Amino acid sequence: MKETVRTYGRMELAQVYFPAILPRSAWKKLKALLMDNPQTASLAVLSRRTFLPTEVSVIFSVLGVP
């Protein structure tokens, strides 16, 4: 399934990458993946709960489109 670049909640985006697990666990896995890459590490520690389209675009380019 091709996802579009738009604003995503962090749990929502995590569920896109890991649909078979609970949202909280999916977020922990996505956060770990984001922390492993210097381009996306700052996104993992944001205090807000949404990713803007530009941030989603960076995540998709680094991790691949789910």
Label each PLM-derived region with a short phrase.
Residues K2-I21:
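Polyanion-binding surface elements
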Residues M1-K2, L52:
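Generic detector of short alpha-helix boundary/capping microenvironments
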